[in-house]
Amino acid sequence: MKKIFLFLIAFVGIVACSKSDSGSSDNGGTGSVAGYNPPSWIIGTWINDLTKTTGYSFTKDDHCMIVHGSTCLLSGANAKIVSKVEQEVKGDVYTIKIIMNEGSSTYEKTFKKIADNKIAELNLAGEIESTFTKKK
């Protein structure tokens, strides 16, 4: 009986300690795909300062690219191919990684808040690649 009791305590401890506290929501918060829960400062539509026609849109439920129209990655037909969303928020830096088709392709972007109405897209070295202004 003592062995069963110790086993149950160990099992509960292992299960309780295996839950992730990575900052992403396991159930996606209010997001449409599990794991998607962007920081409030990035919610909105952001237009590229150079092209003035391309950009990104972030809502509580979706992440969209604006290029000759809008392509949303977490809704519609695209939601069916999304396997997993990983994200990391470190202060004013937000990284989103969308894994599609069980890992056969990955979309990853890192953004940094510069001001309330300005963000930058960072390259792999952490350098500013493009800047974006929040659409009013």
Regions found by a protein language model. Give the residues of each.
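N-terminal glycine/threonine-rich, aromatic-flanked beta-hairpin/loop signature
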Residues: L50-E102
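Structured alpha-helical
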Residues: F11
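Residue-level detector of conserved, well-ordered beta-strand and adjacent loop positions
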Residues: S18, I47, T59, T133
